[in-house]
UniProtKB/Swiss-Prot annotation:
Stored PANTHER family: ATP SYNTHASE (PTHR15184), ATP SYNTHASE SUBUNIT BETA, MITOCHONDRIAL (PTHR15184:SF71)
SUPFAM superfamilies in UniProt: C-terminal domain of alpha and beta subunits of F1 ATP synthase (SSF47917), N-terminal domain of alpha and beta subunits of F1 ATP synthase (SSF50615), P-loop containing nucleoside triphosphate hydrolases (SSF52540)
Name of the protein described by the UniProt record: ATP synthase subunit beta
CDD domains, per database record: ATP-synt_F1_beta_C, ATP-synt_F1_beta_N, F1-ATPase_beta_CD
Matches recorded under Pfam families: ATP-synt_ab, ATP-synt_ab_N, ATP-synt_VA_C
Residue positions binding ATP: 156-163
Family per similarity comment: Belongs to the ATPase alpha/beta chains family.
Length: 467
């Protein structure tokens, strides 16, 4: 194994010089040698080679804090890419980007390790799926149903409920699905990771979840690679013939970490200051999150939308790869309707009568038409008031307001904050409830009866109490 020396250190980007005949390959992992002069630096600090500059010099990203580094320090080439433990031993454990345990529960009992850089499955190995995955959340099951082995994006600005929605999905699917899950925390709050761990522990599903975290306080190198570490663990389970759930919170921070180091690596920035390799980096990650003939990966990804602008290059690049897009709206959150999913902006490739069935399709489209009509009439109502509307329009507005409220639902994971018990609504109940609403069978009920209830029967009971 060849030894090199640090020649330049700018933030997270470090240049290291090796003998010309022993230059490391791109993506090789390099490790800081232990010596008296490295006492102030992070012990066993790992670097990943990004570029070969020539004359034996390579440009690397530090996967850890570069505090305490200085020129001349010795670095060893491991002659292999970064690898993480995979298999049964990772379940119930919390790991960092390098697969080291951070839950103080001893070493990880796994003999096998896999490199985090893998090729995407070949075209002939892929297996598309049309089986629906029931989530128990009305607005999702009705408007943008998920497919087993599909990819879902939760799009939303700051504070509209991406993480809470994801927690509820994990809570509902991981418990109902009783399969294995991998959670990758990419550049999010450490508190949320802690909450997630305890949530899983209290629900007794911790032994079915592997967790990898590279949170907000960590250097960009960790945040850039932690999604790949989590994905590598999920791929191992898929290749064993299992159906896996892969959660990523938040995919935008993965892009952002790439942006942070891109300029330091000497690349010209592209639109809005993003790295020029944005589409390639996203494609490399997303193409690996797929289902093969041996097993499936169903992935649910939270996507932060900067300044609520869906045309920003980062969310726009993510859109291309998804089967279902769940758009969270600040306007709906402002009305106090949670989950704040926008039923007119959210889409799903599964919303096809041949996949979901004719009745489901008709009800979902009728709900969207009613809400769209209400949206169009809103300006007229604001200027002239309700009295100027035709009887048909008045009826459409009243139904739309009831539908809007019926799309809200109390969550299990929010019980602590709201005090109202969470509700899981089966798909059949969801379709029945909205069918009654659009058919006018609930026109006599007050709209307050539909707010924060589970099934339509609960709305009828609530209406009796309100009278």
């Amino acid at each position: 194994m060849s030894i090199g020396n640090i020649v330049q250190c700018i933030g997270a980007v470090v240049d290291i010089e090796f003998p010309r005949n022993a230059m490391p390959k791109v993506y090789d992992a390099l490790v800081l040698e232990d010596s008296s002069e490295t006492s102030f630096a992070e012990k066993g600090l790992t670097f990943e080679v990004q570029q070969q500059l020539g004359d034996g010099v390579v440009r690397t990203i530090a996967l850890g804090s570069s505090d305490g580094l200085r020129r001349g320090m010795a670095v060893k080439n491991t002659e292999a890419p970064i690898s993480v433990p995979v298999g049964q031993g990772t379940l119930g454990r919390i790991m960092d980007v390098l697969g080291r345990p951070i839950d103080e529960a001893g070493p990880i009992a796994s003999d096998e390790r896999r490199a985090i850089h893998q090729k995407a499955p070949k075209f002939d190995e892929l297996s598309p799926s049309t089986d629906l995955l029931e989530t128990g959340i009305k607005v999702i099951d009705l408007i943008c149903p998920f497919a087993k082995g599909g990819k879902v994006g939760l799009f939303g600005g700051a504070g509209v409920g991406k993480t809470v929605n994801m927690m509820e999905l994990i809570n509902n699917i991981a418990k109902q699905h009783s399969g294995l899950s991998v959670f990758a925390g990419v550049g999010e709050r450490t508190r949320e990771g802690n909450d997630f761990y305890h949530e899983m522990k209290d629900s007794n599903v911790l032994d079915k979840v592997a967790m990898v975290f590279g949170q907000m306080n960590e250097p960009p190198g960790n945040r850039l690679r932690v999604a790949l570490s989590g994905l590598t663990m999920a791929e191992k389970f898929r290749d064993e013939g299992r159906d896996i759930l892969f959660f990523v919170d938040n995919i935008y921070r993965y892009t952002l970490a790439g942006t942070e180091v891109s300029a330091l690596l000497g690349r010209m920035p592209s639109a809005v200051g993003y790295q020029p390799t944005l589409a390639e980096e996203m494609g490399k990650l997303q193409e690996r999150i797929t289902s093969t003939k041996t097993g499936s990966i169903t992935s649910i990804q939270a996507v932060y939308v900067p300044a609520d602008d869906l045309t920003d290059p980062s969310p726009a690049t993510t859109f291309l790869h998804l089967d279902s897009t769940l758009v969270l709206s600040r306007d709906i959150a402002a009305l106090g309707i949670y989950p704040a999913v926008d039923p007119l902006d959210s889409t799903s490739r599964q919303m096809d009568p041949q996949v979901v069935g004719q009745e489901h399709y008709n009800v979902a489209r009728a709900v969207q038409q009613t809400l769209q009509r209400y949206k169009e009439l809103r300006d007229i109502i604001a200027i002239l008031g309700m009295d100027e509307l035709s009887p048909e329009d008045k009826m459409a507005v009243n139904r739309a307001r009831k539908i809007q409220r019926f799309l809200s639902q109390p969550f299990h994971v929010a019980e602590v904050f709201t005090g109202s018990p969470g509700k899981y609504v089966p798909l059949k109940e969801t379709i029945r409830g909205f069918k009654m609403l659009v058919d006018g069978e609930c026109d006599h009920l007050p709209e307050q009866a539909f707010y924060m209830v589970g099934s339509i029967d609960e709305a009828f009971e609530k209406a009796k109490k309100l009278q």
